[in-house]
């Protein structure tokens, strides 16, 4: 661990505007890249943080920069390009921030009169299409996604936007997450909110697996189920959800979106982020929906207040749903990711890090068929391998206490986030391993493999380097869960060192090779591997 007098290294260069690499550059390979590993590693994240004299406030606000590593027969090339969203083009043309983002309110056009600038406060805000969170797939096509109603369809070879898609033109939702789930046949599931006279609802969305016509996007999408928010004007914020073979699991957590503050944010001169608050006086609730019928199950499952961004996996066993989540006990971390905080150095940076809640993996068990005659105060979980409990209360609610899927050694790694599994074979199934980033800094500074059965860790770390979310790619035809490789983009603020694509053997968690590119890259969010 860091000693008491050793400050965290400054990472400001990882959170500054980068240049595009429009022409593919060949990487210098050290070690070896497996010959069978042929495809694209696609990643996205914020890559431009100012226009003219205007500066973004929050890390999440930066313009989407698309990254592509192409692997073919042991060689690797890299290129990148800013997503040509309407927001990016409007800001570029105006030479200023024209469209507001999560943590930055666009100021009125300085060329307008004082009266015009005042009146512009009362005009409805333009929703950003700066989709900088993840690559997602619908009907075989790839889209850039965030949490608004807009997605951008992209040509993954050229990194060019081909179409802008609005969820609200197809179904009655005001957005959708950047973390959909997929059935083996390609059917996609997602979640999005809707707002109406009766308050706010959380909607389960289903998108068909295939196109009926060549030009289709998300045609045929439908709302499978609508779940009323516990508080009409304060729905919960969520970033992902869980899915098993038969059920969708939604976690309604006490991070609240105050709709009135969000609606009036422009008038009040505040960004969207001002309307989000951590309210731990509320407990966390789990909602379970049958994927096949759209029926919301009657079980009322509650737990302590916590924040989760990413679910790890969920599966069914002995009449229960088991769901594993990365959890924080304090939900105020969103505000800490102001760029002025992330770019600090020395004691100031240390103080920001100390305020950040650490994220740890926890397992919850939700018994599905609870008899009205079930005894109060009794643990209803039959799972001998988990210490997670589900206890019926006097009011019929079921109180769920989690099992920690870690030992003290994970605390020394700063917790874990950006969890990934062998999704193609083990999503929605009982599994043994997941992979993530350790956080001894404000961004990931290690890669970790967790064995959820015995809670042991394997760790990869290189001092002064910061790895991205790990992506698991299975060996073709492999039977074992961890037979494959881990891909991660590893970057450094040290200008004399090269950034690189790291390839780890997933089983031993040792390095097979790396592909170095002398290109500046900002720290990003999510990505995916696409075989070719």
UniProtKB/Swiss-Prot annotation:
Fe cation binds at residues 179, 239, 310, 526. It is found in: Mitochondrion. The keyword Transport does not apply. Induction: Up-regulated by carotenoids. It is an enzyme of class 1 (oxidoreductase). Keywords: Dioxygenase, Iron, Lipid metabolism, Metal-binding, Mitochondrion, Oxidoreductase. The keyword Iron applies. It holds the Pfam family RPE65. Disruption phenotype: Homozygous knockout mice lacking Bcdo2 develop normally, and both females and males are fertile when raised on standard diet. On a diet supplemented with xanthophylls, knockout mice accumulate derivatives of these xanthophylls in all tested tissues and develop liver steatosis with large lipid droplets in hepatocytes and a significantly increased triacylglyceride content. Accumulated carotenoids impair mitochondrial respiration, induce ROS production and cellular signaling pathways related to oxidative stress. One of its GO terms (biological process) is regulation of reactive oxygen species metabolic process. Its main location: mitochondrion. Belongs to the carotenoid oxygenase family. Broad specificity mitochondrial dioxygenase that mediates the asymmetric oxidative cleavage of carotenoids. Cleaves carotenes (pure hydrocarbon carotenoids) such as all-trans-beta-carotene and lycopene as well as xanthophylls (oxygenated carotenoids) such as zeaxanthin, lutein and beta-cryptoxanthin at both the 9,10 and the 9',10' carbon-carbon double bond. Through its function in carotenoids metabolism regulates oxidative stress and the production of important signaling molecules. This is Carotenoid-cleaving dioxygenase, mitochondrial. It comes from Mus musculus (Mouse).
